[in-house]
UniProtKB/Swiss-Prot annotation:
Listed name of the protein: Dephospho-CoA kinase
Binding site for ATP: G11, S12, G13, K14, S15, T16
Family: Belongs to the CoaE family.
InterPro entries membership: Depp_CoAkinase, P-loop_NTPase
Database matches in PROSITE patterns: DPCK
GO biological process terms, semicolon-separated: coenzyme A biosynthetic process
Location (main, coarse): cytoplasm
Gene3D superfamilies: P-loop containing nucleotide triphosphate hydrolases (3.40.50.300)
Intracellular or extracellular location(s): Cytoplasm
One GO MF term: dephospho-CoA kinase activity
Claim: Kinase is one of the keywords in the record: yes
Gene: coaE
Pathway where this protein functions: Cofactor biosynthesis; coenzyme A biosynthesis; CoA from (R)-pantothenate: step 5/5
Organism: Caldanaerobacter subterraneus subsp. tengcongensis (strain DSM 15242 / JCM 11007 / NBRC 100824 / MB4)
Amino acid sequence: MRVVGLTGGIGSGKSTVSGILAKLGAKIIDADLVSREIMEKGKEAYNEIVDCFGKEILDKEGNIDRKKLGSIVFSDKEKLKRLNEITHPKIIDKIKKMIEEEKDKDKVIVIDAALLIETGLYKLVDEVWLVVVDIDTQIKRVMERDGFSCEEALKRIKSQMPLEEKIKYADFIINNSKDLRKTEEQVRLLWQRFDRRSYFD
């Protein structure tokens, strides 16, 4: 079994790349989905987050409103740090279990995580694949996808590790600034060598 860590900044197009990899046969573990799951009512991180940030982050049904929580933590570095301290260990534990439960030993598992490096998830993988995009495209994508203003989009981008730092951890870089066909070509080339190698190691 091989484990790839797929990362990139918000709006870099990680989801596009993980979608291509899923079609090629990879098992995708989406860290954002895991994060959402552990915040659900009755799940691992729910009580701790509500105790820390107050009931004002809840919607009418008592669920954590991620937009409300986001507006708090992305305006205050200390609060973001506190949220990460609560959630990151639980996300790592859950993903470790998901990898351990995979029965197909020839499978390539891809951990799709914006915070792969910051959380320490990169220590679980054999290779780190970094998706990069030019800053103007990144801002535009975040604004369109999340309905943010330019200022809000920049705030989210700047809250993450700078690209120059992420590059230091990357084994391979996928440039997603151009059209989808170019991105697919890069991903297929990486997949072919990685997938082939998994059978001969």
